[in-house]
Amino acid sequence: MADQSSLFLSRPCDVSKYGLIWAGVQKNVGPAGMSIVIIREDLIREDLPEFVPTYLRYKTHADADSLYNTPNCWSIYCCGKVFQYLLANGGLEAMAQRNEEKATVLYDFLDRSQFFTAAVRKEDRSLMNVPFFSPSKEQDAEVAASAKAAGFDNLKGHKSVGGLRASIYNAMPKEGVEALVDFLKKYEAEHT
């Protein structure tokens, strides 16, 4: 089982390795308000405890060809546009390469920085969300505020971790990551 919300469609995935993949579409696929479920047939069961509501039973949706309720047509339309874009631009292999390049730009800077510190060990790093820290919580807040003033929104870290976080999902172009690194370099030069 895997929640792949952050990495769904960011790279190829062998779905045969999973019994169930769930993904909220709001990261890489479309607007918030829809989820995608890929489930192995043997896990679509009828023998669930009575307290599980009808809507939360995967069999309900499988039997109704995913049309148990009125679908979110706008999200489906937008997702379709994303699928067309991915197919027209090299598929998931090409997207994986672009995402690797973007993440490398940011991680290379963080690994060389004397001011900022990458929050995650190299072998565990995400290509979609890059958490990092400045020397202090107060400095993190100042970096986030300065970044916002410079046009870089939502750099504040996740509420459970703190620090800073750059979300560089599929829609973020490499040029956007390079611009962020330029901003961080300038900020570091002005504060060391």
Question: Across the structure, where does each feature detected by a protein language model lie?
Answer:
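General beta-strand structural signal in soluble alpha/beta enzymes
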Residues: 1-4, 22-24, 154-157
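Catalytic PLP-binding core of fold-type I/II PLP enzymes
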Residues: 1-16
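Conserved active-site segment immediately N-terminal to the catalytic lysine
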Residues: 15-26
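Active-site C-terminal subdomain of aminotransferase-like
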Residues: 25-107, 121, 190-192
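Short beta-strand-to-loop capping motifs
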Residues: 39, 132-136, 168-170
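A short linear hydrophobic-aromatic micro-motif
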Residues: 115-119, 151-157
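Conserved PLP-binding catalytic core of the aspartate aminotransferase-like
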Residues: 116-147
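PLP-dependent enzyme catalytic core of the Aspartate aminotransferase-like
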Residues: 149, 158-192
